[in-house]
Amino acid sequence: TNLITSGVLITEERLKKFYDAGLDHVQVSIQDTDPENSEKIAGYKGHAKKLHTCGLIRKVGLPLTVNAVMHRQNLHNLKSMIDLAVELDAERLEVAQVQYYGWALKNQTAFLPTKEQLDNATEIVEEARVRLKGILAIDYVVPDYYAKRPKSCMGGWGRQFLNITPAGKVLPCHAAESLNFLEFDNIKDKPLSWIWENSDAFNRFRGTSWMPEPCQSCDRKEIDWGGCRCQAFALTGNENATDPTCEFSPYRNVLDEPLSNVGKEEIPEFIYRKINVRKPMNGIGHNSNKSPKS
């Protein structure tokens, strides 16, 4: 079992309860080593709390992974991010370049790195892997816009992993709720084994029978499993489409514009995700019997 968290609401008491319940591992996302830029990216002042939480995780004896969410506006601090992971006594660092679906797709121009940035990051990671062997394991996820073949997202839909949201929904991957036509069963209502084996959501893209051409006749169909369903749906509107990051996808052209413009345009401001809170009209709450003045 693995907890993926921002770290801003975790207490030592809660971590101890997680440990006693059998939690195996914790991952904490860190947006940058520069506190000011970290909070600009996150849109929330939580950098110091994240670092404190990392210390608490190690204090209670849980293994720590630092999730370094990297992109165009923080890759210049990749070396210091690696150093920070060592300082925090992390067992593992995931240098994960932003994947462009969900809210990241809305900020694609602000996030997508240049090819030069990506090549430099790859060199830094390869050097650090050698230097820190036996000290820090480093996973490296590149933006698949630059790839010729898609990644095997989650090792294939419904094959190896599942994700449980704070509300109890059981998902085949972290971003699966972006597939808004699917319904996800809740662990509060049904046994986890039943959801894994029988739910419509987990069976929707499991295996290869759902695949169109060219995936269906591809010799890699049981290697990359058709790529990312969330990305295919976000970029094409067709959940069954071959992932556009594949060089053989009929939708590969949707990546041409962002890739041709990266580094040439001015970096836009971030579009932040905000929770809209209903405000009472003229100071009158929604439970009031009074009518607002016209």
Q: At which residue positions do the language-model features occur?
A:
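C-terminal accessory region of radical SAM enzymes
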Residues: 114-146, 175-225, 235, 249, ...
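Short beta-strand->alpha-helix junction loop in the catalytic core
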Residues: 6-9, 32
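Glycine/alanine-rich phosphate-binding loops at beta-alpha junctions
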Residues: 1
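Short cysteine/histidine-rich zinc-coordinating motifs and their immediately flanking basic loops
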Residues: 227-233, 239-240, 257-261
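Acidic donor-binding/catalytic loop of UDP-sugar-dependent glycosyltransferases
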Residues: 12
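Short Fe-S-cluster ligation motifs
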Residues: 200, 243-288, 293
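Short cysteine clusters
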Residues: 153, 168, 173, 215-218, ...
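Radical SAM enzyme [4Fe-4S]-AdoMet core and its adjacent flexible, acidic
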Residues: 16-25, 29-171, 175-190
